[in-house]
Amino acid sequence: LYVSLEPCSHYGRTPPCADLIVTKGVKRVVVGCIDPFARVSGRGIQRLRDAGIEVRVGVLERECRWLNRRFITMHTHHRPYIILKWAQTADGFLDDHYQPTMISKAMTQMASHRLRAESDAILVGRVTAERDKPQLNVRHWVGPAPERIVLSHSTTIDAILERLYTEQRQSLIVEGGASTLKSF
């Protein structure tokens, strides 16, 4: 059996995956990376080894950590994985903040909307929200719309990240102007 992340060893929404692997009689398990979640963190691997299963850990670890980057960031840094997204002209400029300017093309809009569909929340600054009135939903891709968050003077980034962590939101995409992006 090949898995990108260590099988869980605790009861949560589902029974432990490690127990299922043991009961199914699997002889060998190849694990890409260890689960950083405190309730697992090596215990799943130990459960398998205690049952006599041959376990190899760290195969394609870098690639597996990339696949699980949102989950891993959540459990190692106690905040969501953050994606900074902006559109700029070929000569490196953002829009002028006076008129909403469409810089993105159809393909980049699709890519942006895919990122939105894969993210739990989306954040823009107050100025962007007021001037551009962005929809911040998913239209050019299939998937759920992320939670909309507007950064204002009354809210700090740390408070937003703490709330998202508490709610187990694993990813945040920031689509702000220059000052919002610089805040991260």
Question: What is the predicted function of each stretch?
Answer:
Residues Y11-F184:
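Zinc-dependent deaminase
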